[in-house]
């Protein structure tokens, strides 16, 4: 019997690996449906991609591998009936990305759920370790080891001064990231100081408030809002150190929000962008 401790907390009232009692599977799952793009990529990196029988339409990585995997809708609007048709013995979900109603419906149908709720890089690492254990991943160390080494290196580095950093995740209105989000911790671990850190969740901020924050670095991700070169002028027009010092950067949103095999490279790239001259 495979018995890896997932924990039961108040997140959706479902099995959550990070806060409560036990959860067990009789054997390693053979038919996995992943509702989380970054964890779909992780499952393939772990060496169990052949067991992934379902994915969302946003699960596009690795592109050469996922093409033949059945789609079950989006991350927020999962086709529960289609998932059940695939007869999974494990569904992989994350609180931040998947709708409570979909996860509850699958649980009510008797489907084992792995539900992660990472709010920090350390949480994400623990989640990956638990998932790797449950699926008996043959390449777990090859994926997780490099992330742990980069993470510990950044924790020990302790920059002399952390640049004030603004990361909008939406426009119209602008929305930043609060202290209880995964992106906040990614910024902090990478050496920045999140200017919206006094807030929670995703605070709405005006251009005037952005100027008051006086960010020294602005990172414009291409997801969830697709910031592009057309948005740069609006930020360079602000009276902020990031504009004066030419430190407004368009970045791949996956650097900030994806868990899994790309985390080591993401943390390295972000720490380089947040290193002031």
Predicted regions and their residues:
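Short terminal hydrophobic/aromatic SLiMs and anchors at protein ends
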Residues: 2-3, 10
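Compositionally biased, low-complexity segments enriched in small residues
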Residues: 6-7, 23
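Short linear motifs in low-complexity or flexible loops
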Residues: 3-5, 15
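N-terminal ligand-binding lobe of clamshell/alpha-beta domains
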Residues: 12-277
């Amino acid at each position: 019997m495979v018995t890896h401790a997932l924990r039961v907390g108040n997140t959706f009232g479902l099995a959550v690996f990070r806060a409560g009692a036990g959860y067990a599977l009789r054997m390693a799952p053979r038919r996995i449906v992943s509702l989380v793009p970054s964890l779909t990529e992780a499952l393939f990196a772990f060496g169990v991609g052949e067991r992934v029988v379902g994915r969302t339409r946003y699960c596009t990585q690795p592109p050469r591998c996922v093409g033949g995997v059945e789609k079950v809708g989006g991350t927020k609007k999962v086709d529960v009936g289609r998932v059940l048709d695939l007869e999974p013995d494990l569904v992989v979900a994350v609180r931040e990305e998947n709708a409570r109603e979909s996860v509850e419906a699958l649980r009510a149908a008797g489907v084992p759920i792995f539900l992660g709720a990472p709010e920090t890089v350390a949480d994400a690492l623990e989640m990956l370790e638990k998932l790797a254990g449950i699926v008996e991943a043959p390449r777990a160390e090859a994926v997780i080891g490099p992330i742990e080494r980069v993470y510990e290196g950044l924790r020990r580095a302790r920059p002399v001064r952390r640049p004030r950093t603004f990361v909008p995740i939406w426009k119209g209105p602008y929305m930043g990231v609060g202290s209880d989000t995964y992106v906040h911790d990614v910024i902090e671990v990478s050496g920045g100081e999140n200017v919206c850190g006094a807030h929670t969740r995703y605070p709405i901020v005006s251009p005037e408030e952005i100027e008051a924050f006086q960010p020294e670095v602005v990172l414009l991700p291409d997801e969830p809002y697709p910031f592009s070169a057309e948005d740069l002028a609006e930020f360079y027009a602000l009276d902020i150190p990031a504009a004066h010092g030419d430190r407004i950067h368009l970045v791949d949103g996956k650097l900030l929000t994806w868990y899994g095999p790309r985390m080591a490279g993401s943390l390295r790239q972000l720490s380089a962008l947040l290193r002031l001259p």
